[in-house]
């Protein structure tokens, strides 16, 4: 035989439970914390293919990375379809020593039945860059309770109809994103805010609007879509 060096495994795995799929690759947040490694986390929720094409399913991805070099430590994903594809891509990125700076530029086959013009993996890269470039500051779902107890206010920028379909069980200031610029006077610049929407895109836009207007604000990473999955007891429905 030919002598070849085994470079080891990064622990890529997948499991199906009924109609849901969960997969992971690389290091988890728990392992990073146990080893005292510096890291940042970003969550992105998207569709397995173009949302306007029939049959699109939600895919939620989590990326862990080193905040200075952008080294990708690991990733996890959950959803009904398309999770295997994204985790396989991210596992290949880790093995190939790609960083978060490479993810927005990755190119995939595209047609509406198969993917989106910007794949959720691309969006992970953009969201991670927003953090390391100082355009965004986020908090994780498990930090929300302590942040609110410390005096921060929760701002939801979804529509009124979205709030009726589910909201967090916290004291909430509600201003839809399309009304935010006109209603900035209703907010207190001496107050710190945590902003949220459904999946994180609109709350990022709101965060940028508020910061440019002189407010102190952080984005709830993963927003409502993630929170209702990981802490369903913290969500209420109806009026």
What are these regions (language model features)?
Residues 21, 79-80, 96, 199-200:
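Short beta->alpha junction loops/turns
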Residues 25-26, 86, 203:
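Generic non-transmembrane alpha-helix signal with a bias for helix starts/N-cap capping motifs
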Residues 101-112, 116-153, 160-192, 198-239:
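Rhodanese-like catalytic fold shared by cysteine-dependent sulfurtransferases
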Residues 42-43, 154-157:
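Short, conserved beta-strand edge motifs with alternating hydrophobic and charged residues
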């Amino acid at each position: 035989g030919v002598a070849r060096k085994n470079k080891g495994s990064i622990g890529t795995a997948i499991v199906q439970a009924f109609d849901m799929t969960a997969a992971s690759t690389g290091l988890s947040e728990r392992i990073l914390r146990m080893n005292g490694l510096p890291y940042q986390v970003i969550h992105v929720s998207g569709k397995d293919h173009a949302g306007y094409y029939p049959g699109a399913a939600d895919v939620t991805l989590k990326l862990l990375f080193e905040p200075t070099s952008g080294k990708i430590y690991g990733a996890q994903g959950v959803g009904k379809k398309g999770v295997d594809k994204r985790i396989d891509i991210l596992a290949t990125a880790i093995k190939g020593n790609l960083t978060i700076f490479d993810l927005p530029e990755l190119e995939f086959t595209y047609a509406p039945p198969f993917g989106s013009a910007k794949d959720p993996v691309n969006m992970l890269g953009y969201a991670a860059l927003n953090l390391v470039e100082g355009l965004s500051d986020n908090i994780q779902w498990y930090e929300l309770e302590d942040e609110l107890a410390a005096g921060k206010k929760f701002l939801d920028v979804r529509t009124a109809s979205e709030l009726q379909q589910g909201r967090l069980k916290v004291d909430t200031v509600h201003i839809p994103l399309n009304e935010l610029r006109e209603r900035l006077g209703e907010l207190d610049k001496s107050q710190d805010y945590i902003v949220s929407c459904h999946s994180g895109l609109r709350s990022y836009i709101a965060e940028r609007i508020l910061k440019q207007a002189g407010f102190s604000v952080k984005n709830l990473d993963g927003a409502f879509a993630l929170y209702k999955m990981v802490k369903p007891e913290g969500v209420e429905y109806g009026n």
